[in-house]
Regions:
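Low-complexity, glycine/alanine/valine/leucine- and proline-rich hydrophobic stretches
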Residues: 151-161, 165, 174, 182-190
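C-terminal regulatory or interaction extensions
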Residues: 169-171
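Alpha-helix N-cap/helix-start motif
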Residues: 30, 97, 175-176, 195
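Short, charged alpha-helical interaction segments and adjacent helix-coil junctions
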Residues: 2-10, 73-81, 85-90, 177-280
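Accessory alpha/beta interaction modules
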Residues: 1-163
Length: 280
């Protein structure tokens, strides 16, 4: 079964390929990511370092690392990292995603402290921004914001510097009309959806990528590669299934032969007893 590839010109910002291109292309990456942070978080950010598809490797060979779609480090005048933004678009529901975020946060924090540094006030503020085209919590909110608080005294804030947000492109509650239009554009990135200043800015970045013939060619190559991988995986699965079926058939045949042999032994034993009785 081949991978069904969306036409390049129809890709939306939520598509992993287009999002990656927008986040890495020198012509679009800084403007695009600043636009996201400005309109999703309501923040203007200063000097930044962009780490697209940032891989945080494990410290031990038998442990797991983590890949972030795009990490943005905001710097102060001394070039120290003061805030980290991890932006992740998601088009597929994951039941255990909050725990996946917990793991990602631990990896980000681990990489934010140098060995021997015991001053935890240096740990940057962290915003984990998830953009989903489904409602992860079922309350129809445009945005779900999570920060730690005390259960017994909810007014007590546990300030560990971490804010986790889910922006739901299908939500209708809890946000402004501009935010709703912005989220709708992220899910369906068509010129007709670019009806606000912010969405028109996004549309400009999207057009720069889609009008680039080299990127379009890379996308077609990407699709061919996925087709090849899909075919190889299918062939391996079929080969494994055939081998497993053959092994199972051999097992059944062996069990059948064992039962027949056991019955034949019993019959032979009975026959021997009958022969002995007849000869007496």
């Amino acid at each position: 079964m081949s991978y069904v590839q969306e036409p390049f010109e129809k890709l939306d910002v939520m598509n992993n390929f287009l999002f990656n291109q927008l986040s890495t292309n020198p012509k679009t990456k800084e403007g695009f990511l600043r636009c996201l942070i400005r309109n999703l978080l309501g923040k203007e950010i200063g000097k930044i370092v962009i780490r697209a598809e940032n891989m945080i490797y494990p410290t031990l060979p038998d442990k797991r690392g983590v890949r972030l779609d795009v990490q943005i480090d905001e710097l102060n005048l001394k070039d120290d990292i003061t805030t980290i933004y991890d932006i992740e678009p998601h088009r597929d529901f994951e039941r255990d995603y909050p725990k996946k975020i917990r793991f990602s946060q631990a990896q980000i924090d681990k990489n934010s402290m140098s060995s021997g540094n015991n001053d935890f006030s240096c740990l940057p503020e962290l915003f984990i921004v998830n953009i989903t085209n489904y409602d992860p919590f079922g309350d129809d909110q445009m945005v779900y914001t999570f920060q730690k608080k005390c259960i017994e005294a909810p007014e007590v804030v546990y300030n560990d510097g971490v804010t986790i947000l889910y922006f739901n492109t299908t939500g209708t509650k809890g946000g402004s009309d501009d935010l709703k239009k912005f989220l709708e554009y992220l899910e369906k990135s068509e010129p007709e959806k670019a009806v606000t200043f912010a969405t028109q800015e996004l549309q400009g970045y999207v057009e720069q990528i889609k009008h680039d013939a080299e990127i379009g060619g890379n996308y077609m190559t990407f699709g061919d590669l996925l087709d090849k991988i899909t075919a190889e995986v299918a062939a391996e699965a079929a080969e494994k299934a055939t081998a497993e079926a053959a092994a199972e058939a051999a097992k059944v045949a062996a069990e059948k032969d064992a039962i027949i042999a056991e019955k034949e032994a019993i019959i032979a034993e009975l026959q021997a007893k009958l022969d002995k009785q007849q000869n007496q």
